[in-house]
Amino acid sequence: MDYFKTSIDQLHEQLRSGKVTSSQLVDETLAGINQLDAEVDAFLALNADGAKEKAAAVDAAGIADDQPLAGVPIAIKDNIVTKGVVTTAASKMLANFNPIYDATVMQKLDAAGAINVGKTNMDEFAMGSSTENSAFKTTKNAWDHTRVPGGSSGGSAAAVAAGEVIAALGSDTGGSIRQPAAFNGIVGVKPTYGRVSRWGLIAFSSSLDQIGTLTRHVKDAAQLLNVIAGHDERDSTTADTPVPDFTAKIGQDIKGMKIALPKEYLGKGVDPAVADKIKAAAKQFEDMGATVTEVSLPHTQYAVPSYYIIASSEASSNLQRFDGIRYGFRAKDVKNIEDVYVRSRSEGFGPEVKRRIMLGTFSLSAGFYDAYFKKAGQVRTLITRDFEDVFKDYDLIIGPTTPTVAFKIGEKVTDPVTMYMNDILTIPVNLAGLPAASVPAGFVDGMPVGLQLIGKHFDESTIFQVAAAFEAQNDYLAQIPGGK
């Protein structure tokens, strides 16, 4: 199936009309993955038998008008648990973990008739910005196989961008959906914190993690979010807030909309060529009848240190459960219980995960809690207030998703601080719990640039409205990796 030229709506129409069956679609998708993934390395495991079984069931039941995802093959990031399909979080610690239940988002997708064709590669336990931290393989950027696909949802982004699947799920803790989407020239959406259930998401940082979507088209993302959003009694952090039809405002003009462009998002560290693409996008919005005004988010500069203290502290707590006793990797030839703990965790976790566990444990220790973790929480509040002040007068905030285009594989992996700074523009959104998306905004040196759109809490609909208006004005999706 040529996913480069297809939307979920078009697939739905073909399935409804009988031009193609779900079984045929799954067979073509699996064949395409087997052909393309030798170069991209986006997948860790295929769910071939399960996908074929589900496709046959969908074909037998038929597809209703109100089931746009029925029979549609999608990919799932490997930190979302899938019953009967090995789920590793790209870690040696979980190399043979076969879940006995489905995450809430998987249950919702299954009920909607969507088909999981496989699990995608990622940075181990979602800790990374390049997918180089996977214990199993290094995924390549769909546009240039010498460059990173971003992270931590790099496998999902590369799979969609390379045309292996039409859509995928990812998770976003500090930019892990939006940054790979920007690097691969696709649409990545991080919903409001609490909009989508985290039940069944292998935890990294519980106050920051959020499941979201990676697609080629804005409306496809809205349709996916329509299915996976909503309150879940098994996740106390999900909001009991009505879920609108996220496609409802797509196609509406943006005349009169007030858009903010923070000066900090185009400042030091941002490639001038990337900044120029964002300024060009701002001009397009003005031509469409919106106003774009420079504003300030003054505490942006403190976002990265605040985030890495909070996220690492929560990770050190969450990952205590991987102890070599209950499940997961266990070291061999251990001498005693302490040896089980120490060696299983030392051998089972990769370098970046161990680095963050150590940082988090230090930040939570009695002598340093106030100086680090408590202060990081206070900075988080200041960053949230910055956004609240801007949203008193504006409908949306825009800026670049990343400071640069995708960098070379191996270029930053040995320099954690440089790697962490790549998330400077996405992290503030997670700290504030806001919804945001990255959409294609052109190219620099042949590599995609992402435009980030940040909305008010639970106002994903406005993001989709503006993103779709921008998408309609541009033909970036017509440009395909490898000239296919």
UniProtKB/Swiss-Prot annotation:
Cross-referenced SUPFAM superfamilies: Amidase signature (AS) enzymes
UniProt keywords, alphabetically: ATP-binding, Ligase, Nucleotide-binding, Protein biosynthesis
Cellular compartments per GO CC: glutamyl-tRNA(Gln) amidotransferase complex
Gene3D superfamilies listed in its UniProt record: Amidase signature (AS) domain
One example GO MF annotation: ATP binding
InterPro entries assigned: Amidase, Amidase_CS, Amidase_dom, AS_sf, GatA
EC nos: 6.3.5.7
Any one GO biological process: translation
Reactions mediated catalytically: L-glutamyl-tRNA(Gln) + L-glutamine + ATP + H2O = L-glutaminyl-tRNA(Gln) + L-glutamate + ADP + phosphate + H(+)
Active-site residues, Swiss-Prot/TrEMBL: K77, S152, S176
Pfam families per record: Amidase
Enzyme category, top tier: ligase
Top-level division of the source organism's lineage: Bacteria
Role: Allows the formation of correctly charged Gln-tRNA(Gln) through the transamidation of misacylated Glu-tRNA(Gln) in organisms which lack glutaminyl-tRNA synthetase. The reaction takes place in the presence of glutamine and ATP through an activated gamma-phospho-Glu-tRNA(Gln).
HAMAP family: GatA
Subunit relationships: Heterotrimer of A, B and C subunits.
Family: Belongs to the amidase family. GatA subfamily.
Name of this chain's protein: Glutamyl-tRNA(Gln) amidotransferase subunit A
Organism the protein comes from: Lacticaseibacillus casei (strain BL23)
Primary gene name: gatA
